[in-house]
A protein has these predicted regions:
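Residues in well-ordered beta-strands of folded domains
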Residues: 2-4, 74, 160, 173
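Conserved polymerase palm-domain catalytic core
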Residues: 25-139, 148-150, 159-162
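Charged boundary/loop elements
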Residues: 1-32
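Short, glycine/acidic-rich hinge or "gate" loops at secondary-structure transitions
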Residues: 1-6, 116-118, 154
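Hydrophobic helix-cap positions at the C-terminus of alpha-helices
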Residues: 19-23, 108, 144
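Low-complexity, intrinsically disordered short peptide segments enriched in small/polar/basic residues
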Residues: 10, 105, 116, 131, ...
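Short, conserved micro-motifs composed of acidic
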Residues: 143, 153-181
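Short glycine-rich loop/turn motifs that provide flexible caps or phosphate-binding loops at active sites
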Residues: 1, 7, 84, 88, ...
Length: 181
């Protein structure tokens, strides 16, 4: 969403609003807003390099040069080794992060073709569908994300549930957004 399209990111906002109107109080529908912990700083560099090699081979040597060895970070008299994530300020950072996330997003779409919406803007995801499917997507992300350095920040994920007639399968620390606002 939003790449090379003026106002492209807003399309997901409008889609969410429209789906919320359409589903109204349907107890079988739910929306999950996904949040990853420290997303850009935690992506697995081995996975990132593999994705660059596969998808953007012309950039591979440069990205490998920049990310195949730990970067030295100076903190006072201490030198820290940065071994994960993309470097702050790297103009390729959003692209590299997206390359790591993309296979997970494709897996979600393949395994859950009946989702009403599955949209990502960098590390922000919005998933709308049946309670059962969205819960299974949540579990898939928890299971498959860490191998890519994508760890759900469960306390910052949000659920919007128009009507809670169904049992709630999500962990208690996932935030429930009040339907009133």
């Amino acid at each position: 969403v939003g790449v090379a399209t003026p106002g492209g990111a807003e399309a997901s906002v409008h889609a969410v609003r429209q789906l919320a109107k359409e589903f109204g109080d349907d107890p079988g529908k739910i929306m999950l807003k996904v949040d990853f912990s420290n997303a850009f700083n935690m992506v697995d560099r081995t996975e990132m390099l593999a994705q660059v090699y596969e998808k953007l081979p012309s950039l591979y040597r440069w990205v490998e040069y920049c990310y195949s060895n730990p970067a030295h970070l100076f903190f006072g008299s201490c030198v820290l080794q940065s071994v994960a994530g993309v470097q702050q300020g790297d103009p390729l950072g959003p692209l590299l992060f997206s390359l790591v996330l993309h296979p997970l997003a494709l897996k979600i779409e393949a395994e859950f073709p009946n989702l009403d919406l599955c949209v990502w803007y960098l590390d922000d995801g919005t998933i709308i569908g049946s309670v059962e499917d969205v819960h299974k997507v949540f579990e898939l992300i928890q299971r498959d994300g860490p191998a890519r350095g994508l760890h759900l920040n469960v306390k910052k994920n949000e659920i919007w549930w128009p009507s809670r007639a169904s049992p709630d399968p999500f962990p208690a620390d996932v935030d429930r957004v009040d339907n009133a606002g």
